[in-house]
Amino acid sequence: MDDQYKNDHQNFVSGNDGSTFFETCFILTLMPISVLFQRVVFATFFNNDKFPLPLALRFILEFFFIIVPFISAITFTELTPFLIVGMLITCLVVPMFAQKNVTIYFKNPKETLLNLNSMRKGFLEEYRAFVMAATCICILAVDFQVFPRRLGKTETYGISLMDIGVGSVVLSGALVSRQSRSSLIEKQQKKKREEEEDDNDKINKTSSSSSSSSSALKQQQQQVLSRSSLMWHQVKAQAPLMILGFVRMILTKSINYQEHVSEYGLHWNFFFTLGFVSISLAFLKFNANISAILGVVLICVYQFLLNSFGLTDYILNHPRDNLISMNKEGICSFVGYLAIYLIGTKIGTELFKVRSSLTEWRKFATKLLISSIVFYILWILCEIYIDKTSRRMANLGYVLAILSINLFNFSINILITLITGNHNASVIAKSINRNQLFIFLLGNILTGLINFSMKTIYAPVEQSMIIITSYTFALCLLAFILDYKNINIKFW
């Protein structure tokens, strides 16, 4: 990459003050609304058990019903309200013209409840997959002029779509962490042990006693083993992220690729943040309640240091004269992301909690919505009295914004599951979830290749839209093929 274009590109993505809280929330709401739209259309026109929709055709239709509207919303933002209103009206009107009665509301309450309480939750799969899809789309789209500058990552203060995307990726990882699922895992293991003991008891009471003692001893040994090897397990599990972080760092330096230094620093990148956040959890093995409290204390202390001990001035103005100061943004913002992860484990525990009725799930969705509003009010108070929101520092305002917007999206996703009675994730969501890390890595590689093959910031609108849509389709298609072939891509 020649130096002149590199400087032009860096200037192109720099100096952004961001968008508004509501515009960001509005755009992100489009994904779950698109899922509702897709389900209603499928239930109306493709609800035939004798002639089920071919999987390949389903994938293509889902891409146009769910992914394409999001691409349109982030490139032509003025279309967003029309897309949302149009989809909602369609959901109300289209079933009226169906040849047979379409039952959308509570189609199968028992089955819906069973699957809402299962380990694999469709609404959570869709949330995580679409966070990743949105992230992959935006990391390329931001390099084109068709992508509004206000949606790109902010320079220092402000809030934007891409700012929220970064924190949402961290939060989505926390939601499905072992710590979040621990209570459900323990219940399943306990139930399995009880069933085994009952079976043994039927065979022989004596052997049952022996087996029970053996089982207890084995469990105790496994517990000791898990504690002693947790750190090594976490390091091994996060090794791919750390390796990718080093590979990205080396490549960007060696090929003179454009960098936004104020984002994470001179050497740090988002792969390091994700890896270190997960590894840190090995030292902080608490239950979800304590983790949430620790997360709150951590972000409050961090904000106090930013305001009262000159940490803000250090991050924004201190010269990059040693390894730590060269990467001050990445190192300091790590604290904010860790707080998001710790609080996220508590949210995940609530999501995985077994509920006895759909009414309880409706109450839970309402509780999430109210919590979202509370965090929004706290965010406003933080903006006025404490500090402006900053992704660069991952401060208190940033954490509150991440929690507010994501809890709002969770509540919508759960309500859509309750309304449609459809508990299965879409084909695209299921496919992306199988190989999330690989899709994210591939998205980064393709983004780099596209930036090297053309001067993206000078591309006309038509060419930009074709490239962004084709790139997204290629990622989704590969994810779909890997899932169809039952292939998991791992590097360890």
UniProtKB/Swiss-Prot annotation:
Please list where the region (Disordered) is annotated: 185-216
One Pfam family assigned to this protein is: GWT1
Point to the regions of Low complexity compositional bias.
205-216
Q: So where does this one cross the membrane?
A: 26-46, 59-79, 82-102, 127-147, 156-176, 264-284, 290-310, 331-351, 364-384, 399-419, 437-457, 464-484
Q: Does the keyword S-adenosyl-L-methionine apply?
A: no
What's this protein's family per the entry? Belongs to the PIGW family.
What this chain does, per the record?
Answer: Probable acetyltransferase, which acetylates the inositol ring of phosphatidylinositol during biosynthesis of GPI-anchor.
Q: What is this protein called?
A: Phosphatidylinositol-glycan biosynthesis class W protein
